[in-house]
A protein has these predicted regions:
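Extracytoplasmic cell-surface/polysaccharide-interacting catalytic and binding patches
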Residues: 1-48, 136-139
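N-terminal start-of-chain detector that recognizes signal peptides
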Residues: 27-28, 54-60, 91-96
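Amphipathic alpha-helical interface surfaces
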Residues: 32, 36-43, 65, 81, ...
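Extended, low-complexity, intrinsically disordered C-terminal regulatory tails
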Residues: 41-70
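Short connector loops at helix/strand junctions that flank enzyme active sites
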Residues: 51, 78-82
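Catalytic cores and adjacent binding grooves of peptidoglycan-active enzymes
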Residues: 74, 79, 87-139
Length: 139
């Protein structure tokens, strides 16, 4: 199922961890799919239009998968409101951040690092107020 011009649902439900643990990571409600489509249209597609292809490393997570990867108990990934974006380099990540901060719809924008690996967590709420939180986290 196509969520926007360049993003399909399978990019957001694909998970090596789910496959390894035998967890079926599929959206369980229309709301989750609508939330992912909103995230794509308002945040990810504009980023892709500006910079070319981007890689989603984590999108939708059903609760069992979210627990298995150590996600927060109230993670927006479980509602289809969030995605983690692979960063090919720190410089490219800084370009992504600068652009994402200019978008009119943004709930959270988090620069995350675990050792030498960095990624950006981005979220947008289709319903409710977007907080425009900017943070960084070192795991």
């Amino acid at each position: 199922m196509q969520l926007s011009k360049n993003f399909c649902l399978s990019e957001f439900t694909r998970s090596d961890t789910a496959k390894r643990l035998g967890i079926e990571n599929e959206c369980s409600s229309v709301e989750q799919v609508l939330n992912l489509a909103y995230l794509c249209h308002m945040v990810l597609q504009p980023l892709r239009d500006k910079f070319g292809p981007i890689r989603i490393t984590s999108g939708y997570r059903q609760p069992e998968l979210n627990g298995a990867v150590g996600g927060a108990s109230n993670s927006q990934h479980m509602r289809g409101e969030a995605a983690d974006i692979y960063l090919p380099s720190v410089d490219k990540g800084l370009e992504y951040l600068a652009f994402l901060k200019t978008l009119p719809v943004l709930d959270q924008l988090i620069w995350e690092r675990n050792g030498d690996i960095c990624w950006i967590h981005v979220s947008a709420k289709r319903l409710g107020k977007n907080r425009r939180q900017l943070r960084s986290i070192v795991h």
